[in-house]
């Protein structure tokens, strides 16, 4: 008969094995920009919200800043289903989809294309699984859609002279949540198979150790960068012509900076106080995240004046003009 001590020994052994398995199979670093970077991106963007947008958002800077790291709070192994489902939301390996241009705007069409590619690939077909490729632009556009829908509801409630406190809370949540992904995409290592150590031909001798990702976005940013360092780089928002296409262009631009991260690491740029070159690079990447976030908020607000709920009657030129007039009125409240 097993004793209590032997059962306890086996139980502890099982816990150790489980933790080892988790560490072995964890494929991606736990966060982008760390808690500080994501908080700073959201704060800087919120402080730049124009007066043409609702006043309650301009008063919610602290709440929006707090929500910057929120999706990283969903990545604990103690909430397995949550962690597992949203792990691919934080990255996209653009090298794996270089054959697919343009990327489809819909998540499920993207899945279909990947599975077709996987079926036709003999060598490492699982590289084309959606969870391996990453789904970063799709979650971003889905949260953007939630924000736009909430803005639309806010407009309708205001026009009907009904309370708006509940939808204001939803808008703040979606705005902060969206900020996380806009920030992720500004970190070049979230766009590449070289996300945590150089892979492939390496004539320049870049690091292959699995630590560059966290050293860059975590301890280095926390110790050396503050929101005020990059806030002046963020300008007034601009309306995006095509949010999805513009966001993909932003991701691709970020991916062009991957080698620069490795060059800076090789030069000791992320050790201790780092180097002036690393500081300049990092502040510009954080500013790019805040600028993109601000542009997304602004575009969602403007588009919500035109967007209609499902089964709504078509909008005429007259009602569209009326909506634009209401938009200017609502912004001051």
Which residues are covered by each model-predicted region?
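N-terminal secretory signal peptides that target proteins for export/translocation
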Residues: 1-9
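Absolute N-terminal positional cue centered near the fourth residue
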Residues: 4-5, 19-20, 35
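Alpha-helical and His/Cys-centered functional microenvironments
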Residues: 8, 13, 42, 186
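Intrinsically disordered, low-complexity segments enriched in polar/charged residues with Gly/Pro
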Residues: 8, 20, 168-169
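Bacterial N-terminal signal peptides
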Residues: 13-26
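N-terminal, motif-rich segments that launch catalysis or mediate targeting to/interaction with membranes
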Residues: 26-175, 191-287, 291-333
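Short alpha-helix carrying the canonical HExxH Zn2+-binding catalytic motif
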Residues: 171-185
